């Protein structure tokens, strides 16, 4: 009781001392759960994991304990262990779509996208009405270069949830990248922006569609708005450079590409999705410099 009071008052060090006395006298589940929560809140994932290993021994058939253990290992970047635990969970509850979904996300974090696709497909077989599963499967397929599969799954997500703004954005952007169905792409982006009018990435997609349609002035206006609503992003600066270059504003295009190049190199480990090629950016910069020199 004293330990619980300390916990509620966020006097965590005192609570830990009391909980350790409790488990020494009578080992059971609740103190270990609360100690793990304290350790996690203090950034001591190693100690939180230790508590959940004790819990797994106390209650080896508890799905909640197994899944939370997997979560902690994932946060501690021990993805192989997290994946193994989630695989065990699928054996315990083979008809639980949420577990297959969690396993797919773990595979994604471990850069095992092929296995992530298979797990996501299993989740969808068990729950074919979940729009987020279709969206995530579509994103995985796009990353693998399967644009047809990506488009099909994004459409399915929208069929289930017409207000799925991210799916509308994704579809519009894929169409723009391929340079086809640009009017349809525009429709999707307008729907996405009705739902999230200040989403910088949606505005970037809209700008890129205008650029592909040959309207660089409209494209520039959207990209400039996009930069207001996002953190510095190398893809947006690359797009900005391309648009400025098309408008023959070579000085500013060079500056935009330099920003993109710098962000790409300095944040290369943090860029999970699309990112510019540094050499391509350098080539663009050199081309713009030559044109600037020719104009003098």
Describe each model-derived feature in a short phrase:
Residues 1-296:
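Alpha-solenoid helical repeat scaffolds
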């Amino acid at each position: 009781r004293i330990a619980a009071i300390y916990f509620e008052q966020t006097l965590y060090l005192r609570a830990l001392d009391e909980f350790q006395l409790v488990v020494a006298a009578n080992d059971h589940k609740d103190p270990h759960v609360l100690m793990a929560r304290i350790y996690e809140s203090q950034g001591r994932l190693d100690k939180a994991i230790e508590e959940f290993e004790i819990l797994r021994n106390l209650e080896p058939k508890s799905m909640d304990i197994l899944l939370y253990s997997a979560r902690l290992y994932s946060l501690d970047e021990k993805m192989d262990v997290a994946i193994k635990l989630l695989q065990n969970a699928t054996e315990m509850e083979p008809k639980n779509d949420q577990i297959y979904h969690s396993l797919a996300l773990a595979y994604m974090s471990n850069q095992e996208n092929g296995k992530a696709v298979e797990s996501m497909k299993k989740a969808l077989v068990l729950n074919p009405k979940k729009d987020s599963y279709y969206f995530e499967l579509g994103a995985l397929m796009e990353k693998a270069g399967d644009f047809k599969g990506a488009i099909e799954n994004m459409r399915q997500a929208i069929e289930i949830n017409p207000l799925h703004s991210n799916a509308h954005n994704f579809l519009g952007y894929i169409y723009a990248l391929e340079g086809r169905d640009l009017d349809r792409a525009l429709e999707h982006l307008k729907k996405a922006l009705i739902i999230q009018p200040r989403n910088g990435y949606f505005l970037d997609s809209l700008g890129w569609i205008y650029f592909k349609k040959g309207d660089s002035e409209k494209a520039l206006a959207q990209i400039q708005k996009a930069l207001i609503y996002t953190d510095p992003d190398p893809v947006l600066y690359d797009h900005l450079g391309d648009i400025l270059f098309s408008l023959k504003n070579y000085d500013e295009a060079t500056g935009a590409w330099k920003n993109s190049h710098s962000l790409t190199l300095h944040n290369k480990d943090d860029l999970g999705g699309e990112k510019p090629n540094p050499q391509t950016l350098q080539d663009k910069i050199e081309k713009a410099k030559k044109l600037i020199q020719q104009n003098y």
